Swiss-Prot record:
Function, in words: Could be involved in insertion of integral membrane proteins into the membrane.
Protein name: Putative membrane protein insertion efficiency factor
Compositionally biased residues, Basic and acidic residues: 88-98
Family to which the UniProt record says this protein belongs: Belongs to the UPF0161 family.
GO CC, any one term: plasma membrane
Length: 127
């Protein structure tokens, strides 16, 4: 509920004020993705509270003394129950490519499997 409201506010900013700023001053964002896209991705991936905190940290880095550049949102954390089902790193065999650690599904060990290709399943919002 709160995440939906925050995403609607971000989208409203992107459609109105952000476009006005770009029209008057040109593109001024020092980061890629922009802070509003970063905030939307963080809220989708991490929820309203953690996503808002990550977005606030990003906004605090937006000043003339920071070099900016590519700064992607952090990957989502695993839920504790999902993390408990996964083998710990020291117990896992790094040569075992028959199981996907993210879903636990049995996979053929060919190059097009989602585990080998690095599929993250993330959805990002675009301006």
């Amino acid at each position: 509920m709160l995440a939906t409201l925050l995403l609607a506010l971000i989208r409203a900013y992107q459609m109105t004020l952000s476009r006005l700023i770009v029209a008057l001053m040109g593109p001024v964002c020092r980061f890629e993705p922009s802070c509003s896209r970063y905030a939307a991705a963080c809220i989708v991936d991490h929820g309203a509270l953690r996503g808002s905190l990550l977005s606030l940290k990003r906004l605090c880095r937006c000043h003339p003394f920071h070099p900016g550049g590519f700064d992607p949102p952090p990957p989502p954390r695993l839920h504790r129950a999902a993390a408990a089902r996964m083998p710990r790193q020291r117990d896992a065999d790094p040569r075992d490519t028959t199981r996907c650690s993210s879903t636990g599904a049995e996979l053929a060990s060919h190059a097009s499997s989602p585990c080998r290709a690095g599929f993250s399943g993330r959805v990002t919002l675009m301006d």
